[in-house]
Amino acid sequence: MHIIENHNTRAGRVYCYAGECLWDKQLKKYVNPRVLVGHLEGEPPVFVPNKKFSLLLADTSQIETEEHDRKIIAVIKEKYGNSVRLGKPKPVRVQTHTAKAVFSGPSVVFGGITSRYRIDTILTKAFGEDDAKNILSLAWYLASEGDALINSDAWLSHFENPTGHQISSQDITRLLDRMGQDGILSFYKHWLKRFEKTGDKMLYDLTSISWHGHGIDMASWGHNRDNDDLPQVKYALLCTRSTAMPLFAWPLNGSVSDVRTLQDTLAFLDKLDYKPDCLMMDRGFASMENISFMLGRSYKFLQALRVNADWIRKIIDVGKQARLRPSSMIKAGERTYYASTARCQWVTLKKTSKKDTAPAQETLVYQCKDAKGEQYVAQVGEEVISQSPCMVHVLFCQDLVGSQWDKFMEKLNGEYQRLLANKHAEPTNELKKYFTVERKKWARKRNVDFNMERVTNHRDNYTGHICFITNDQTIAVAADALTEYSTRDYIEKDFDEMKNDLDMRRIRVHTDDRMKARLLIQFVAEIYLREIRVRLRDSDECRKMTRKQIASHIKGIYKIKFLGKYKDICPELSKSQRSILEALNIRDSR
């Protein structure tokens, strides 16, 4: 360990640092951490320690001083000897307080929501009373300010909160370490229990949280939704359709494809004794495996589909005449759709193609000829393992043709450039049918070209279509599927809120367990924001308020607390403050 003197030109002062050279096992290189210990003054220079080391140098016993600080003190004495000037303690000014202002707005609003959903009780069951108060206080801070937790001390010391005091960055780190996976999953189990029999449909989606640094094992390269050239962690979120109340959230490895995350999330929910009433998902989760998984375990769902699979194209082709009928027209907003619905059986069967070969398991989608949906009859060499009834809704919109075609051509062109750049690359399964890749005998390069017959067929028959598959009897017609699916923007708003208003665009911790704990605090903060947004949306007075305006009105609620026997005085609320409390159905509890 040694002293480093650095002249700061802007400050016009020489600052002193205690530096050392350490070997980092994880980075496999030497690092040079520095600690500021003071500065030099006068001529000849005299060392003036900062507040921390001034107190340590004044303490002659140093019984409670940490070993690392003792080494720094020894280096300071070795370097400067007697040329050390300790600061004089500032005189303590005694003040006699008659009254003080207590800003209780966040306590009134967030406390009311906490009581409504018993969030404090659930947190206490999962983490104990003290940690529950700390988690609530940090969640209130996030919901109010949306800044990094390390900056919470000023807010916690200014506003009423469950802890009653500020929480240092070291205490926040210890809290994240204590929370643990068992406590986090216990919280989700108790929270999900409140929404067991609501009969509401559930929205499920993923987002990306970028990360730069080391220590997060779950961070990997993958499709980044924010277009950041950084490793990422995927974040799965489940929320209710009617109010978008978040129910469950969990980080996943950043390299896992969207399709494969669904079964992992449902396995988590099954272990927590929760089964969604009806899952609503976008096309990113559509696959034969996922649909078979959900049907086999009796999950109800509404799944948007890509139109690139052969089985869905057959259904589109069969329903073409039905969609040409004027009676198939559906008006939704400014768009016009033409719809058809096919009753199907999702069939899993064993099929033997040759003698002395083991039967192969296959999945097929059988379009029922009967309106009631007859079952599939096994053919020669087939054995039906299971079959589940479902409905496929197909909608065609002329307004979507242009945008879908442009996206399709852009995707084809990107794949074409990739194949030209890498002579060993193969087309993806999704786009394989639209390319011809051949290498002629003795040729140096392979020939990559478009299969224009199939490209033209896609343009003429399949652009402008959106498709859904469901086994929920309450979504019996295509108009119902379109109406239900249009509410998916709720979950997109949740993600935008978490990233832009709750400091979730970057991971700011350095271990997987701390990340999961940090995301739980984020999840609790989102409960408050979602409750405020949904209830204020239905209020004529509050509907046009921005998030900053709402937070400003809430933080402006205060009371004057007198010392001694005098009662507190609660100043009159403004019209906006009264409107917010009325819309939230929260009484003024000052």
Q: What are the residue ranges of the model-derived segments?
A:
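Acidic, metal-coordinating catalytic cores used for nucleic-acid/nucleotide bond scission
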Residues: 280-289, 307-310, 513-515
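Basic, amphipathic alpha-helical segments enriched in Lys/Arg and hydrophobic/aromatic residues
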Residues: 511-532
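Short amphipathic alpha-helical "interface-anchor" segments enriched in bulky aromatics
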Residues: 481-508
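Dynamic "connector" segments at or just before major functional cores
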Residues: 1-215, 236-249, 253-255, 263, ...
